[in-house]
C-alpha cells in the first residue's frame, strides 16, 4: 500500500511538468469573427445583431439604470445609500466620458457592423436580412437618442438646436473618424429621425420574432417620442411626432370589458 502511494504521488508530480506545454498557455482567437469572412448568411447577420441587444442589457443601461434614471435625477426618488448606488455625484466626468457613454457606443458599433454588411452577397432570405439591417438602423437611432438626452446641451442656458449634442457614429472603426467631434443637437435629431425612417422602410412585420426585438411599430413609437422631445428645440418636429404616433397600430391591444375610449 505504501509503495502504491509513492507511485501515485510520483506520477502526479510528473504530470505537473508534462501535462501542458507553452502552446496550451497561448490564447487563441477561435471565438473571434473576421468581419470579412465571419458574416456569410442571414443567420450570421442575426447573430451579430443579437450581440447589440446583449450589450444593452447590463445593469448600467436597460438592465436597470436607463429605466429608473429619469426618476432618480428628480425629486421623485432618492437613494438611502444602503447599497452605495445612486448617491450624490459632482458629475465630474473625464474627457473620455462616463456613465453609459462607453456602453452605448459599443452597442452602436455592432449596429454599424450590421448596417455595413453587403447583404446582396450573403446567402439566405434577402427580406430577413433587410429586416435585420432595418432593426440596426432603428436601434442605432435609439442608442444615439439616449446619448443625446444624457449628454446633449440643448437645454443648457437655452442652447436649443445649435447647442452641442453627441458624436453620431455611422461607420465601424473608420480610420479617418476614430475620434469623431460632437455634432449639434439639431444635427443629432435629424440623424436619429433619418435612421428611424430608414429602419421603418426596411423592416417587415412578417419577420418579427417577439416584443424583445425592434419592430416597425416600435420604431414608429420611438420616432414619435424623439420628435416630441426634439420639438422643444425645433417646433417643426411636433408634426412629425403626431404623424408617427398615428402610424402606431393598437389593434393588438385588448381593453378591459368595463373600459371605454
Where are these regions (language model features)?
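Sec-dependent bacterial lipoprotein signal peptides
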Residues: 1-18
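Conserved, well-structured interaction surfaces
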Residues: 83-151, 183-186, 198-207
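Inward-facing hydrophobic residues that define packing positions of alpha-helical scaffold repeats
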Residues: 108-111, 189, 196, 238, ...
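Aromatic-residue-lined binding/catalytic grooves and analogous aromatic/hydrophobic interfacial grooves
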Residues: 217, 222-250
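Membrane-proximal, proline-rich intrinsically disordered regions
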Residues: 20-68, 245
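Short coil/turn linking the two alpha-helices of tandem helical-hairpin repeats
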Residues: 148-149, 153-155, 207, 229-235
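Conserved small/polar residues in nucleotide/adenosyl-binding loops
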Residues: 251-257
Amino acid at each position: 500500500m505504501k509503495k502504491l502511494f509513492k507511485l501515485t504521488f510520483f506520477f502526479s508530480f510528473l504530470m505537473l511538468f508534462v501535462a501542458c506545454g507553452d502552446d496550451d498557455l497561448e490564447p487563441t482567437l477561435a471565438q473571434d469573427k473576421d468581419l470579412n469572412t465571419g458574416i456569410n448568411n442571414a443567420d450570421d447577420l442575426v447573430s451579430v445583431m443579437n450581440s447589440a441587444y446583449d450589450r444593452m442589457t447590463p445593469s448600467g443601461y436597460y438592465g436597470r439604470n436607463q429605466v429608473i434614471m429619469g426618476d432618480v435625477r428628480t425629486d421623485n426618488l432618492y437613494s438611502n445609500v444602503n447599497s452605495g448606488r445612486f448617491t450624490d455625484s459632482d458629475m465630474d466626468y473625464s474627457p473620455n466620458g462616463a456613465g453609459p457613454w462607453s456602453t452605448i457606443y459599443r452597442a452602436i458599433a455592432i449596429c454599424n457592423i450590421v448596417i455595413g454588411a453587403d447583404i446582396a452577397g450573403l446567402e439566405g432570405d434577402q427580406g430577413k436580412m433587410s429586416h435585420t439591417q432595418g432593426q440596426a438602423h432603428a436601434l442605432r437611432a435609439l442608442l444615439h437618442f439616449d446619448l443625446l438626452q444624457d449628454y446633449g446641451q440643448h437645454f443648457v442656458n437655452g442652447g436649443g438646436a445649435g447647442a452641442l449634442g453627441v458624436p453620431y457614429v455611422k461607420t465601424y472603426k473608420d480610420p479617418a473618424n476614430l475620434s469623431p467631434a460632437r455634432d449639434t443637437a439639431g444635427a443629432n435629431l435629424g440623424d436619429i429621425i433619418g435612421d428611424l425612417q430608414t429602419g421603418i422602410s426596411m423592416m417587415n412585420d412578417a419577420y418579427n420574432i417577439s416584443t424583445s426585438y425592434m419592430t416597425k411599430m416600435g420604431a414608429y413609437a420611438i420616432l414619435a417620442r424623439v420628435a416630441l422631445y426634439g420639438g422643444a428645440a425645433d417646433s417643426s418636429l411636433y408634426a412629425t411626432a403626431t404623424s408617427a404616433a398615428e402610424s402606431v397600430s393598437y389593434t393588438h391591444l385588448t381593453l378591459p370589458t368595463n373600459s371605454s375610449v
